[in-house]
Swiss-Prot record:
Protein name per UniProt: Hemoglobin subunit beta-C
Alphabetized CDD domains for the sequence: Hb-beta-like
Function: Involved in oxygen transport from the lung to the various peripheral tissues.
Family of the protein in this entry: Belongs to the globin family.
PANTHER family from the UniProt entry: HEMOGLOBIN FAMILY MEMBER, HEMOGLOBIN SUBUNIT BETA
Residues involved in heme b binding: 58, 87
Database matches in InterPro entries: Globin, Globin-like_sf, Globin/Proto, Hemoglobin_b, Hemoglobin_oxygen_transport
Tissue: Red blood cells.
Organism encoding this protein: Ammotragus lervia (Barbary sheep)
Domain Globin: 1-141
GO molecular function: haptoglobin binding; heme binding; hemoglobin alpha binding; metal ion binding; organic acid binding; oxygen binding; oxygen carrier activity; peroxidase activity
């Protein structure tokens, strides 16, 4: 991946907003992912999900971790080893969900940045989200 391009762009991302929207959209677009978040309260409608404080908080947490990955593109497995263990061994999250969230994140970035999110940037971010998803799914292999 083009590290300079990725980190330069990532520095403009509002992690709390983008994280909240990405996780919220994941839960709305792929409703079966909600089963991991039943303790978050009302997820009955799109508005309920996107307005849910726990979804927003966890979305920020997810993107804070993703930011760590952006800083360590050469060692995604190492960066996400503990989170992989938590999500795979303890929470039994289907690794496909990591790929879905990555794709939703790309959609949200395109929405927030419009023309600035060029096809070249999209190509780079698809590589990054695929790498992160693979690192998170590492415990399944």
């Amino acid at each position: 991946p083009n590290k300079a391009l990725i980190t330069g762009f990532w520095s403009k991302v509002k992690v709390d907003e983008v994280g909240a929207e990405a996780l919220g959209r994941l839960l709305v677009v792929y409703p079966w992912t909600q089963r991991f978040f039943e303790h978050f309260g009302d997820l009955s409608t799109a508005d309920a999900v996107l307005g849910n404080a726990k979804v927003k908080a966890h979305g920020k947490k997810v993107l804070d971790s993703f930011s760590z990955g952006v800083q360590h593109l050469d060692d995604l497995k190492g960066t996400f080893a503990q989170l992989s263990e938590l999500h795979c061994d303890k929470l039994h999250v289907d690794p496909e969900n990591f790929r879905l969230l990555g794709n939703v994140l790309v959609v949200v970035l395109a929405r927030h940045f419009g023309k600035e999110f060029t096809p070249e940037l999209q190509a780079e971010f698809q590589k990054v989200v695929a790498g992160v998803a693979s690192a998170l799914a590492h415990r399944y292999h």
